[in-house]
């Protein structure tokens, strides 16, 4: 039996039904990018989360962005800041307040995902963190983020990491 899969290639219509539409993972990647910028702004300017969210929604087209995920990250990271920072500290060679603010935003977002979004595989969290650091961080910031997340993931997702490495 052939299922009715709307994403399936139709030889009479060479353009798939989802052509031009970003995937769920692409929409989440965009949400993470905006959330990184918003978390940086929150950390540096100390504006309220609602003000930052409103401004980002005015300044950006959310058509191709997972807006709910952006909001969840933007409000979830500050709400869990103490838990996130406590998890990060053992994996750092510097104090939290000595970290580059962009790399701190990326690390907090990634740590939040490791702690609160167990539906997102740890390898995806690490990869997305590295990519965010490449886009927004310093020249070698992605290497630093990778090193920290590689230490952190087994602490927060021990069973998942062990299962993957078998």
UniProtKB/Swiss-Prot annotation:
GO MF annotation, one: RNA binding
TM regions (residue ranges): none
Statement: the UniProt record of this protein carries the keyword Cell division: no
Region (Disordered): 1-30
Family annotation (Pfam families): NusB
Gene3D superfamilies the record matches: NusB-like (1.10.940.10)
Coiled-coil region: none
Extent of Basic and acidic residues compositional bias: 1-15
Keyword annotations of the record: RNA-binding, Transcription, Transcription antitermination, Transcription regulation
GO biological processes: DNA-templated transcription termination; transcription antitermination
Cellular component GO terms held in the UniProt record: cytosol
Domain of life, per lineage: Bacteria
The keyword Acyltransferase belongs to this UniProt entry's keyword annotation: no
UniProt similarity note: Belongs to the NusB family.
Function, as annotated: Involved in transcription antitermination. Required for transcription of ribosomal RNA (rRNA) genes. Binds specifically to the boxA antiterminator sequence of the ribosomal RNA (rrn) operons.
Protein name: Transcription antitermination protein NusB
Gene for this chain: nusB
């Amino acid at each position: 039996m052939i299922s009715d899969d709307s994403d399936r290639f139709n030889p009479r219509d060479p353009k798939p039904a989802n052509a031009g539409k970003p995937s769920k993972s692409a929409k989440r990647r965009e949400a993470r990018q905006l959330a990184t910028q918003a978390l940086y702004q929150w950390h540096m300017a100390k504006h309220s989360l609602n003000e930052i969210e409103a401004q980002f929604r005015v300044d950006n087209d959310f058509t191709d962005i997972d807006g709910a995920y952006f909001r969840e990250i933007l409000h979830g990271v500050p709400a869990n800041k103490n838990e996130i920072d406590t998890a990060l500290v053992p994996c750092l060679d510097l104090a939290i307040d000595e970290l580059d603010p962009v790399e701190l935003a990326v690390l907090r977002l990634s740590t939040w995902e490791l702690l609160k979004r167990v539906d997102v595989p740890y390898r995806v969290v690490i990869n997305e963190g590295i990519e965010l650091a490449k886009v927004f961080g310093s020249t070698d910031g992605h290497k630093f983020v990778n090193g920290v997340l590689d230490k952190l993931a087994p602490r927060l997702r021990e069973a998942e990491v062990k299962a993957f490495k078998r």
